[in-house]
Amino acid sequence: LGLKEPLAAGKLSPETFPQLLPQTVLMAVEDLYDATSFVAGKSAEWGIDPARIVACGSSAGAITVLQGAYFIANENPLTAKLPDGFDYAGVISFAGAVVDMADDLTWKRAPAPIMLFHGDADSNVPYRALRMGGAGIFGSDYIARQLSDMKSPYYFYSVEGADHALATVPMNNYRDAIDQFLTQQVGERLPGHDRHEGALFQQPAAR
């Protein structure tokens, strides 16, 4: 959304993109938090448990949910839009990343359990880290290594040679793994630091 006007005006370029990207992501997270607060506010009416809300997104949506988890972990002022003390029960990202103006991601505390899918040949969203013009885009591989160091629960399914197809393929092909993550690491809060290497259409092995 934040890139539409500069694009239409012909002002989007490799030079301006790093300055525009953080604000664009901020707008997306603001929408995510507004939607989350709306759902949490309807919890009694809809019969849901706000403590079990999972954020899930693909590509730009995956960047949004990961950024949302990163902001919560770091007590970003934007989290004031959320109910007091709120955190997601889990986060599922299909080819996502976190954007930060720093040279590295810094987590004040561990985030909610995170499930990551990404191909290492993705040219749309960086698999590792890309720094450009003062902005850093930190992909799934980079995030998974940090979560491992923090001993924060995560599941990373990495596919060698795969492109941005991992933004969509897992929704249909890896449902068993997703269900297992939701059951064990989100529902039962079991510890887990799992990294799997696989083929694009290969079902992850049961744990």
Question: Whereabouts are the PLM-identified features?
Answer:
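Solvent-exposed loop/turn segments at secondary-structure junctions
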Residues: 1, 60-63, 96-100, 121-124, ...
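Serine-hydrolase catalytic machinery in alpha/beta-hydrolase-like enzymes
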Residues: 1-48
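Short, solvent-exposed loop/turn and secondary-structure capping segments
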Residues: 4, 66-68, 103-105, 126-129, ...
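Soluble non-cytosolic domains of exported or imported proteins
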Residues: 22-30, 134-138, 169-172
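Primarily recognizes the serine-hydrolase "nucleophile elbow" in alpha/beta-hydrolase
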Residues: 30, 34-110
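Solvent-exposed, polar/charged alpha-helical surfaces in well-ordered, non-transmembrane soluble domains
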Residues: 30-37, 41, 141, 145, ...
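The feature captures the conserved acid-bearing segment of alpha/beta-hydrolase catalytic domains
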Residues: 79-151
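C-terminal catalytic histidine-bearing segment of alpha/beta-hydrolase fold enzymes
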Residues: 145-207
